[in-house]
């Protein structure tokens, strides 16, 4: 395919136009008085949202250089969202301000490499000042306030704070769509996985269609079980002990499954057979998690354990196991707390070292099942469009709340950046074009507060100057128009969100400033309509 090439100012300005198209669409959503953006979908109803990353993802520009600029800024929004769950609009606004100021200086003759170095040093200093300002999140109310601001709804904030309080910061909070209006929180104690009983004959509670086994043994097998001969010695020992048995294996089929069902129906002993969750290595890892949680062992040929030789010592135990047709919950496993802590530490290390988002998500789920618990927030709404938008807002607010617990909070509303900058630039010493790079950051960090003020119908520059003169933590409450102590008023942002937004914006701005040439695909000309006529009815003269 033929390429088009642009150099120097033409290349940079083309990219900047793309950035501006995207940023101008996104920044109208910033702050408590930000507006919504309607996104047309090829299929189904349009989406209405005020989430920066959702808007950015939908924007596809036609002009090649503009498209490249927009794609780079999408990366800022996506990366900030992945890390902190919020701050995508702030990151986009910061990137726009940094690029605008930077390109002005490059056009005036500044050295782009020195500018980038100055920007990086200034961002490092502002980040350090932000972390110094951070206040640890200690109360449920503070978490509720942070999540409530992210979701734009205090009720959602309170529900997320309740969920985090129950499952802990390692716990998993999932968001599901509900048929009922409103919000509902469902908590799961113990480990839950998405596999149910292999036969409805195992059900003990007919009304709820559940198999509930109290104080039961748990047999964990890595392979399939089809022959009853392998299982009989162990079954006899379990029956003598007078306990019920849960078997979790790759599969249980044929005469082995039939024997368990017949014994259950005769009342000889209670049991339930469940397929192990996951596939391949992930299944092995989850079986090992269950073994540590319940104090048992995984019966596997690879470690020299066979089913026919297994003893009661190889079985795990739990106070209660609830199995439905779709899922299994193990409550209060009898595992050794030290071994459990070791396993949790191991999974945490794997999360740190993983490069794949998918693997990280799955490891996080395993960690939650072992260390915390699972909370499900069920969200309902009157229309499908509203439901999708609400679900997305709640998911972002959950990540936002976890970020607040992780690194602490700072004053919200764009105030923390300005006040951290004031502290950072007092001691920062730069020379030449690096100093100009530092000044670019100094100007750009005002942009989020100015945009929040503009969206609230106020004069951005006036508000920024006023906030600069206020005590630390005091700023504009854009919802009311008052200047007050924002942390006391519950207007805060996780420092991780603010920090990530600034760092990611600066990273992309550096790429813009140091770009000297662009090579892009030449747009294809639209082909003429079929039939070669006048484009109406194929030239048929109608």
From Swiss-Prot:
UniProt KW RNA-binding keyword: no
E.C. number(s) listed in UniProt: 5.6.1.7
Localization in the cell: Cytoplasm
Keyword vocabulary terms for this entry: ATP-binding, Chaperone, Cytoplasm, Isomerase, Nucleotide-binding
Enzyme class: isomerase
One of the GO biological process terms: protein refolding
Record's catalysed reaction(s): ATP + H2O + a folded polypeptide = ADP + phosphate + an unfolded polypeptide
GO cellular component, one term: cytoplasm
Main localization of the protein described in the UniProt heading: cytoplasm
GO MF annotations in UniProt: ATP binding; ATP-dependent protein folding chaperone; isomerase activity; unfolded protein binding
Record carries keyword Chaperone: yes
Function as written in the Swiss-Prot or TrEMBL entry: Together with its co-chaperonin GroES, plays an essential role in assisting protein folding. The GroEL-GroES system forms a nano-cage that allows encapsulation of the non-native substrate proteins and provides a physical environment optimized to promote and accelerate protein folding.
NCBIfam families found in the cross-reference section: GroEL, PRK00013.1, PRK12849.1, PRK12850.1, PRK12851.1
Record's subunit section: Forms a cylinder of 14 subunits composed of two heptameric rings stacked back-to-back. Interacts with the co-chaperonin GroES.
PANTHER family tied to this protein: 60 KDA HEAT SHOCK PROTEIN, MITOCHONDRIAL
Name of the protein: Chaperonin GroEL
Taxonomic source organism: Beutenbergia cavernae (strain ATCC BAA-8 / DSM 12333 / CCUG 43141 / JCM 11478 / NBRC 16432 / NCIMB 13614 / HKI 0122)
Chain's gene name: groEL
